[in-house]
């Protein structure tokens, strides 16, 4: 196989498990945390790309800070929201921009980003985070369009609530309400995340789209 993968956000609950499962498939996988590379700093991201020359880039890195929009008049809330937007938009653009040159040159590349179920079913207090994930849906459409002729695909995973990742930070009472709202009646699993990632790697005709992996939430 000999394909090299970089996973930004690859040391968290979901990321570390995805690193292990892809590694077991024969890929050479490097999982990076925010301490390893600041995705909002293009020079750092470009340095990682030049060092590893990945065939496949997966971005799980993200920031979240819930706040009602009317409370963004508070300086601290506004600063937290600014960080969310910077990591989830500028950071993602940096990852994509730094990955594309060598992928286009090699005539092979897979870029997989992460969006959110909040783009279709918003929750109060998540306006900034949800908006940042809506940005991802538009980005992959253009990226796929621009790079398909070079055998480079760009897609997004529009994720629901998984057993791991940000879900563990949700208060228990809220978790119960959320789980009851999921038609599947449960959290997503790492196997389901892995299977979707593997599908996107193996299916170049799937390009410029966001795949809903959310247990049927409408």
Question: Residue ranges of each PLM-predicted region?
Answer:
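Residue(s) in the substrate-gating loop at a strand-loop-helix junction
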Residues: 116
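Alpha-helical segment proximal to the catalytic Tyr-Lys
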Residues: 101, 145-146
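Conserved mid-core segment of classical short-chain dehydrogenase/reductases
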Residues: 64-82, 125-128, 168-170
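Active-site helix of classical SDR
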Residues: 96, 132
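N-terminal Rossmann NAD(P)H-binding glycine-rich loop of SDR-like oxidoreductase domains
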Residues: 11, 15-20
């Amino acid at each position: 196989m000999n394909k090299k993968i970089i996973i930004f956000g690859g040391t968290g609950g979901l990321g570390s498990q995805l690193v292990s499962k892809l590694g077991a498939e024969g890929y050479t996988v490097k999982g990076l945390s925010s301490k390893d590379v600041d995705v909002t700093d293009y020079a750092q991201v470009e340095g990682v790309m030049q060092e590893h020359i990945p065939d496949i880039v997966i971005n799980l890195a993200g920031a979240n800070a819930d706040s009602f929009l009317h409370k963004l008049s508070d300086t601290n809330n506004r600063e937290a929201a600014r960080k969310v937007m910077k990591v989830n938009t500028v950071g993602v653009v940096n990852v994509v921009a730094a990955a594309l040159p060598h992928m286009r040159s090699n005539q092979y590349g897979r870029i997989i980003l992460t969006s959110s179920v909040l783009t279709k079913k918003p929750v109060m207090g998540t306006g900034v985070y949800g908006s940042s994930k809506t940005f991802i849906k538009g980005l992959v459409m253009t990226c796929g369009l621009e790079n398909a002729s070079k055998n480079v695909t760009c897609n997004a995973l529009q994720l629901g609530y998984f057993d791991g990742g940000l879900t563990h930070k949700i208060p228990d009472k809220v978790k119960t309400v959320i789980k009851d709202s999921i038609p599947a009646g449960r959290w997503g699993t790492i196997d389901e995340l892995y299977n979707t990632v593997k599908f996107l790697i193996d299916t170049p005709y799937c390009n410029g789209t966001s795949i809903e992996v959310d247990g049927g939430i409408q």
